[in-house]
Amino acid sequence: MAHAIDDLKMVHEEEMKNYDRIESAVVSVMRRHGCKIIQTPTFEDYDTYGTYFPQLQREMIKTISSEGEVLVMRPDVTVPLVKTASREYPDARQLLKFGYVSMVFREYYGKSTHGKYFLQSGGEVLGDETPECDGEVMVMAAEFLESVGIRDMRIDLGSVAYMDALFEELRLSKEELSQVREFLEKRNLV
C-alpha cells in the first residue's frame, strides 16, 4: 500500500476554479496599476535563499538536481524577481512594476491550516521610493482583497523605514515614541 505524504493533496476542479477566479481578479488589478505579469522559476538555487532568508531554511522543500546541486522549490517570489529584474533591467533609475500569482512551496502553519504549498500573489515596484508609490502599493493591496470579495480588512505595514519616517513627521516626544513602539511590539505578539 502506498504511503500518503502529509500535507500533499490533489487540487480538485472546484478548488482550481477558485484559483482561476482569484488569479483573474488579482491580475486584473495588477494590470490596471501597470504591472507586468511574471512567473519565476519553480526551482531555485538553495544558496540564494540561504543567504537572504536563513529563517526559511527549515521550511523550504529541497531536492537535488541531476548535477548534484541543492535546489529548492520556490519558497518566495520576491528574491528571484528582484535578481532577474536587476540582471535584465540594469538601469536602476527605471520604474519597474511586476505582478505575480504563483504557487509557493514551504511549510506553513496558520491559525486553522497548515501545509507545504499555497497560492501567493503580489506586486513589486522597483525604482520608486516616493511616498506616493508606497500609497499606490497599499491601494493595490486593498484592491486585491476587494477583488476576491474581502471587504473587512486591515493592512499592516512592517517597514521600519516607513515607520521611522512616519514617527519623524508626527514629531512625537521620546516618551510618546517609546509608548507607540511598545504598543506595536505587543501587537505583533498577539
Q: What do these predicted regions represent?
A:
Residues 1-79, 83-190:
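Extended, charged alpha-beta segments that form solvent-exposed binding/catalytic grooves
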